[in-house]
């Protein structure tokens, strides 16, 4: 018999995770002719002082929790399956240390977001364990996002989360002390003081979210199948059809289309809303939806004259989803310090995801560079996700 050809097939396989022990040898050298002279290489810096975890292992735990939403107690069970007993408190300590090392990079992201001329903002509850009361209290994560991709703008996409003890409007005012520009938000009343001319940094322009107004009418229609609510949804839908067509155009091009096509639709919508409100019972749910829309009308119309502004704040709402998933699985943060670490690590990981980076590869390299001292504080901008990605691409081209 002789071979006349072959058939080749492929199967996708997996190599399960393997834990290993890295042994670091540091020989000591002595001089027989010198009294008390001993030379030894300095021990490499560790992410956890005197700890047994490598940077790669801590990164794996951090990414598991904040990128893939695996609670730490679940990860301890996974380690047990690999034959390693690790207490949850040990993992907590490692995560806190990772956040400590990454705080300067996080603050750089925060500064970049708040220096932008247009920012999205939203918030979400974050239960935090109060050990004295033996129950949780409801704190907040404020999400600030920049994303100019829908209009080909210059800003790179970034999201940062800032932990606050509650939802008081003062936190937003403190966060935005240096911000001056357009803030795209929902209808939360705590934002209103930001429009005052005498505030530090000057008045902020609030652009409201049309999706929130639409949601008001949708709830009315869902509960009552109101024909007026259905018409409101249809009119708002016309606006979204136009927005879909102009996505990706420049800011100037978007304003041109919005002025010629969207503005007449919304002007007619406002007249229709006022007519409906005059005829509707003041206590009806439809009247409430109409009043909500009219009360926020000026902010809802900002996008007509500014092509950088979106019709809604869905971009920042999408950044809230990873926090919600982690919260659902972990139930709560174990302390205020833990919640702050959650905000730091989620900001860096989710910004990396916006740039289509693998969180494990990116974060392991970044932490290694910071911990080892290879990248100094004044060079942290080199580790920002987009800069790191560009540098990695250049290295791959050079190696090809």
In which residue ranges do the predicted regions lie?
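Short Cys/His-rich metal-coordination motifs, predominantly Zn2+-binding knuckles/fingers
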Residues: 1-4, 17, 32-36
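Short Cys/His-rich "knuckle" micro-motifs
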Residues: 2-8, 40-44
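Intrinsically disordered, low-complexity peptide-like regions
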Residues: 5, 11, 310-312
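Short Cys/His-rich Zn2+-coordinating modules
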Residues: 7-19
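Catalytic center-proximal scaffold of phosphoryl-transfer enzymes
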Residues: 21-400
């Amino acid at each position: 018999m002789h071979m006349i050809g072959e058939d080749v097939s492929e199967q996708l396989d997996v190599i399960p995770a393997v834990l290993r022990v890295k042994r670091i040898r540091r020989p000591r050298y002595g001089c027989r002719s010198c009294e008390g002279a001993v030379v030894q290489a300095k021990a490499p810096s560790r992410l956890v002082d005197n700890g047994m975890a490598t940077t790669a292992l801590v990164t794996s735990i951090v990414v598991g929790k904040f990128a893939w939403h695996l609670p730490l107690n679940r990860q301890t069970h996974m380690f047990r399956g690999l034959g390693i007993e690790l207490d949850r408190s040990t993992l907590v300590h490692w995560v806190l240390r990772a956040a400590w090392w990454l705080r300067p990079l996080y603050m750089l992201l925060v500064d970049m977001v708040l220096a932008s001329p247009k920012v999205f903002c939203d918030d979400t509850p974050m239960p935090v364990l109060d050990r004295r009361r033996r129950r949780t209290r409801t704190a907040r994560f404020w999400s600030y996002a920049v994303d100019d991709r829908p209009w080909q703008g210059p800003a790179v996409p970034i999201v940062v989360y800032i932990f606050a003890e509650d939802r008081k409007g003062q936190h937003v005012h403190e966060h935005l002390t240096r911000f001056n520009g357009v803030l795209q938000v929902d209808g939360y009343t705590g934002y209103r003081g930001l429009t005052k001319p005498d505030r530090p940094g000057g008045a902020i322009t609030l652009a409201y979210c049309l999706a929130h107004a639409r949601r008001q009418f949708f709830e009315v229609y869902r509960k009552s199948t109101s024909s007026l609510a259905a018409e409101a949804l249809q009119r708002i839908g016309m606006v979204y059809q136009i927005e879909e067509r102009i996505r990706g155009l420049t800011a100037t091009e978007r304003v041109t289309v919005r002025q010629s096509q969207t503005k007449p639709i919304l002007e007619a919508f406002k007249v229709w809303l006022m007519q409906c409100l005059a005829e509707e019972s003041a206590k009806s749910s439809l009247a409430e939806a109409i009043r909500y829309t009219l009360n926020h009308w000026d902010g809802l119309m900002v996008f007509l004259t500014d092509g950088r502004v979106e019709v809604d704040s869905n971009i920042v709402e999408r950044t809230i989803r990873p926090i919600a998933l982690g919260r659902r699985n972990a139930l709560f943060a174990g302390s205020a310090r833990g919640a702050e670490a959650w905000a730091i690590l989620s900001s860096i990981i989710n910004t990396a995801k916006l740039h289509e980076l693998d969180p494990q590869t990116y974060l392991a390299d970044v932490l290694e560079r910071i911990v080892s001292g290879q990248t100094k504080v004044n060079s942290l901008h080199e580790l920002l996700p987009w800069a790191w990605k560009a540098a990695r691409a250049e290295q791959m081209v050079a190696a090809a």
